[in-house]
Structures are given as C-alpha cells and as structure tokens.
Amino acid sequence: MNHEELINSLTKKMNGALQVLDADLKGLRVGQASAYFLDPVQVEAYNSKVPILQVATISVSDTKTILVQVWDKSLVKAVKKAIMEANLGVSIISDDNQIIRLQLPIPSEERRKELVKIAHKYQEKSKIIVRNIRRDGIELIKQMEQNTECSKDEAHIYSKEIQELTDKYCDKIDKIIKLKEQDIINL
C-alpha cells in the first residue's frame, strides 16, 4: 500500500465514523418528530425480535406526531408494547385499527441536559473510532518504514499527515456536536 492509498483508506474510514455519529444523533429527539426516532424499537413478531420497520410504516404527520401503520393487524399490540418498553418518552394518543399515533412531548430542561450528555457520549465514541483509525494508520507507516518501503523522514511526514487528518475529523465531530447541542438547548 502506498502513501496515497493509505490516506484515502483512512479518510474513507473516518468518514464512516462521521456517518455512525450522524446515525446515532438521528436517534436523539430534539424538538421535531422524525421517522428515525423509532429505529431502536424491536418488536416481538413471528417468534423473534425484529426492527419496527419490518412490521410497520413510520411517517411524520406534524412536528410532534409520528404515525405507525402496522401491516399485520395481529401485531398492533406487540408494536405498542415494544414502543412503550423502549422508554422513548412518547405517549400513544390513539390507535385506529392498524394506525398508532405517537405524541412527542416537549422535553423538559432536565431531559434536554440528559440529551446533551448523550450527544457528548456519541462525540467521545466517534473520536475514539477516529483515534483508533489513526493508530492503525501509524502502525502501517511503521511497518512500511521497517520494510524499507519508505524512509524515516517520509514516515515522519506521513505520520504528521495522519495526525492532521485526525485533527480535522475530530474538529468536524466537535462542530457537529456543537450544532446538535444548540438544537437541544433551543427547543
């Protein structure tokens, strides 16, 4: 693997860390209803636990209401139970046959602080992923140097480049979390 391929590979992996962070943050409800909000819900259906998206269609009717249209009428109770057990802080306001309406309350000040803490945990998790990618990249540089694929000076330059890439992605993570934090606080 040459220097350019290594940097491209590390960049791709670090972008993956940002995508994981984005997916984690979509699960945090901050003011507006989102179809992603129910992603963590697992429903007991057909003798196994399945994601809610495999048994229902999820849509948003307004900023505070999520509609869950269950495909199989026999699973409506299981879906309601799974939503309640997921502790998402939602209220089931009605269920007309196979459509379940979920009302999202405005988070209290305490809940907002809790959401900020969760966002910071996601931030640290993402930074750890990025740092682990950096560590792996630097290990590869050391191997390249030992195998005389690059000189000591080149290895130093490549390591510095990897560190700069790491700093860039850590800054991106910080900016994403800062925006999310402002969204949470300004509800």
Swiss-Prot record:
According to its UniProt entry, the protein's GO biological process terms are: cytoplasmic translational termination
Identify the domain of life: Bacteria
InterPro entries, A to Z? Ribosome_recyc_fac, Ribosome_recyc_fac_dom, RRF_sf
Give the UniProt subcellular location, in the record's own words: Cytoplasm
Q: Which UniProt keywords apply?
A: Cytoplasm, Protein biosynthesis
Q: Which GO terms describe its cellular component?
A: cytosol
What is this protein's function per UniProt?
Answer: Responsible for the release of ribosomes from messenger RNA at the termination of protein biosynthesis. May increase the efficiency of translation by recycling ribosomes from one round of translation to another.
Looking up HAMAP family in the UniProt record yields:
RRF (MF_00040)
What family is reported?
A: Belongs to the RRF family.
Question: What name has this protein been given in UniProt?
Answer: Ribosome-recycling factor
Species of provenance: Orientia tsutsugamushi (strain Ikeda) (Rickettsia tsutsugamushi)
Q: What gene is this protein translated from?
A: frr
